């Protein structure tokens, strides 16, 4: 009986092992960690221009004036663990300086922010191994839509969460609202990753694959935040070595780790579809044999 159980368990785990092997092979062939390093470098160059463009968008919509403050605190608290307060002060100072720029300088900020979108597009289509190229006008429209609608949607979601907080006077809703707000960063990350994996690749991405890959990436991102914050507070080696400049390597390591998670989610998404195709081809080959 134990032998039969072992055989059944081995039979069920064999496909999973084959899928993990295929995933590891794709990660190695796509040089995922190198792509993450490139994106981290571009992200650091584009960080201040991107934030400047986003804050300018909020300034253009007075209805989001209060939400923009909440969004800043939410982003730095949930997406930049351990050193979010320090980084927020520096970035807000840089953005304040950028507001004094001329129209030509402002256009340069927008172009730099769009270059980050182009780098993300190139990296994800490299992972999907897509040779299909979008028209330049269409690509620009997609990048601009992400750059403009993304922050506005995030602001709207924070407005909803603020409304939920205002309902906490109802004792029967108190526990439910607390639970919703507790998992709100996870849901927001899941939605963002799903949109990223669904919209950016030039090939058609099955919705269920994008959902699974986005969920894994969102969970790893939330765990990564907690693990990274624990590491920084428990082993303060960067502070001891770099002193007041410790925020620079800490920010770079966190951005690099974040892109590793994003690209891993993309690899998982594309591997699910590829494994399904390989399995179907193998079954078809076996059926054709006499």
UniProtKB/Swiss-Prot annotation:
InterPro entries in UniProt: UPF0761_bac (IPR023679), Virul_fac_BrkB (IPR017039)
Sorted UniProt keywords: Cell inner membrane, Cell membrane, Membrane, Transmembrane, Transmembrane helix
Entry keyword annotation includes Transmembrane helix: yes
Organism: Enterobacter sp. (strain 638)
Record field: transmembrane: 44-64, 104-124, 140-160, 183-203, 210-230, 244-264
Name of the protein in question: UPF0761 membrane protein Ent638_4092
Domain of life of the source: Bacteria
NCBIfam families per the UniProt record, alphabetical: PRK01637.1 (NF002457), yihY_not_rbn (TIGR00765)
UniProt-annotated location(s): Cell inner membrane
Lipid bilayer topology: Multi-pass membrane protein
Family: Belongs to the UPF0761 family.
GO cellular component: plasma membrane
């Amino acid at each position: 009986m134990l032998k039969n159980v072992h055989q059944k368990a081995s039979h069920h785990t064999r496909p999973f092992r084959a899928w993990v092997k295929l995933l590891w092979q794709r990660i190695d062939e796509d040089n995922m960690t190198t792509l993450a390093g490139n994106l981290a470098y571009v992200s650091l160059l584009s960080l201040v221009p991107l934030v400047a463009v986003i804050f300018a968008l909020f300034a253009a919509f007075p209805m989001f004036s209060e939400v923009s403050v909440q969004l800043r605190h939410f982003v730095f608290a949930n997406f930049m663990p351990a050193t979010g307060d320090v980084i927020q002060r520096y970035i807000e100072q840089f953005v304040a300086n950028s507001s004094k720029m001329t129209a030509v300088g402002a256009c340069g900020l927008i172009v730099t922010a769009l270059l980050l979108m182009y780098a993300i597009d190139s990296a994800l289509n490299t992972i999907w191994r897509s040779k299909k190229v979008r028209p330049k006008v269409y690509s620009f429209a997609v990048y601009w839509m992400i750059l403009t609608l993304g922050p506005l949607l995030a602001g709207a979601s924070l407005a909803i969460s603020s409304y939920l907080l205002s309902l906490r006077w109802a004792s029967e809703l108190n526990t439910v609202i607390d639970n919703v707000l507790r998992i709100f960063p996870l849901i927001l990350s899941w939605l963002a990753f799903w949109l990223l994996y669904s919209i950016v690749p030039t090939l058609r991405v099955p919705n269920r694959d994008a959902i699974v890959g986005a969920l894994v990436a969102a969970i790893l991102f939330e765990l990564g935040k907690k693990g990274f914050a624990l590491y920084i507070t428990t082993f303060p080696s960067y502070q001891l070595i770099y002193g007041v400049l410790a925020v620079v390597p800490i920010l770079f390591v966190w951005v690099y780790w974040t892109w590793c998670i994003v690209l891993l989610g993309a690899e998982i998404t594309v591997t699910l579809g590829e494994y399904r195709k390989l399995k179907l081809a193998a079954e078809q080959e076996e059926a054709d044999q006499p």
